[in-house]
Amino acid sequence: MSTDPDTGTPGPQLVQYTHWIYGLHALAVVIGAAGTATVVGMFLFGWPSLAAVVMNYARRSEVRGTWLESHFSWQIRTFWFALLWCVVTSIISAPLILLFGVGILTWILGFLAVAVWVAYRVIRGWLALRDSAPVLLDTAAL
């Protein structure tokens, strides 16, 4: 699973490996949407996404300097930013639940927004990978 040192082109095994990572993230989203879990809960705490993030970190050094590096960064950032936004949503919603009872609504809307964002990032990244293109990392899409 290496990169050609002369051209910086990732080997086909690394491309396939990256497809597997997107597949695990997509599986977590689908299980969350179709099952009793939430999309966000399954994405952050379900085994498919946890395995995918571990796989990202395990092979991150092998994709450095290739177009796959953008995919690994995209996948890792998706996971950690989803976690961050869930924590922020929970911190904002908890006192609103206790004080006004509207925190349930802010919690649901916040987690729904994170779920849509996660699904968007998985789809956008996987489509770019299918086209053998890097994911353009724009900070506005975080």
Q: What feature does the model see in each segment?
A:
Residues 57-70:
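Membrane-helix interface/capping segments
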Residues 1-10:
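Short, Lys/Arg-rich, polar N-terminal cytosolic tail immediately upstream
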Residues 14, 20-21, 67-92, 123-126, ...:
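Interfacial aromatic "cap" segments that immediately flank transmembrane helices
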Residues 59-62, 117, 121, 131:
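Residues in soluble alpha-helical coiled-coils and helical-bundle/repeat scaffolds
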Residues 16-53, 77-119:
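Hydrophobic alpha-helical transmembrane segments in multi-pass membrane proteins
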Residues 9-12, 60:
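Alpha-helix initiation/capping motif
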Residues 1, 52, 56:
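Short, basic/glycine-rich phosphate-binding loops at helix/coil junctions
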